[in-house]
Amino acid sequence: MLNRLLIFITLALAVRALDCSSKELQQYNLESVKGTYSISNIKSTPPSKTNITWSIGICEPIKDVADCPQNSDVCGITSILIDGKSPVVSEIIGFNSNVQKEYETIAEGDGGIIVKDKAVNWGDSLIDAEIHFICDKNAKENDLKLDKWDGQSVKLSFKSKAACITSDKDKKKNNGNNNDNNKNNDKKKDNGELWGWFTWIFIFLVLFLSIYYCGVRARGSSTIRETPFYFQSALKEVIENFIDLLKSLPSFIREIIERFTGSSGRAEYSAV
């Protein structure tokens, strides 16, 4: 039976992960793929199997990966698998997120960028790590692969659209589309408010014209000559009343507000 052998390495404590806002990474859209990604490689090592899982944290420390050191953005865990028994963790390699990074652009293909951690202490060894963020404009999913692990250096590749350079023109275009959407929303809002006012005006006009019509009928004025006179007079009266109503609304609302605020103020003053 294998005894649990735990090699646990952590570097200086820190809370900062791979800084996607750094000037080297600003031109990429890595913030859109923020999160933790893992890749496992199982090989037969009779009488057991060995599972090596590497995880990376993009724009934030690695989360929800058991046994990974706190505040690490690159982490490798080696487990021994034996049928009928619980996995035994034999190695834990953690690259703290505060380790000084080195950056190198990728010239081949559609480009990308390499993030490097160099000479990280792990027991008696120094370990290097490289994450190749490779631009793939046709990628439908984000693809993490383990390209190399020889006990001294680990090389991981991450293919994604997020690793493609976004030009200033495209950024302005996206901002322009957002502004157009905001303008359209404002126009829709303004149109809705305008139609609301027209609806109320129409209701008032119909109401007053109905009153006028009833008044004409009550007076018994049904001749053609008398109708225009009463119509013009009533219409003028309706318009004047409607204008007076609109003018009185602000003072009416102000009076209501003053009643509430005034009574509240007096109550506070009396209490003092």
From Swiss-Prot:
Species of the source: Lodderomyces elongisporus (strain ATCC 11503 / CBS 2605 / JCM 1781 / NBRC 1676 / NRRL YB-4239) (Yeast)
Residue span(s) of domain MRH: 18-166
Residue numbers on the Cytoplasmic membrane side: 215-272
Disulfide bridge positions per record: 20-59, 68-75, 135-164
Protein name: Autophagy-related protein 27
TM region positions: 194-214
GO cellular component, one term: cytoplasmic vesicle membrane
Membrane topology: Single-pass type I membrane protein; Single-pass membrane protein
Name of the coding gene: ATG27
Function: Effector of VPS34 phosphatidylinositol 3-phosphate kinase signaling. Regulates the cytoplasm to vacuole transport (Cvt) vesicle formation. Plays a role in ATG protein retrieval from the pre-autophagosomal structure (PAS) and is especially required for autophagy-dependent cycling of ATG9.
Similarity comment: family membership: Belongs to the ATG27 family.
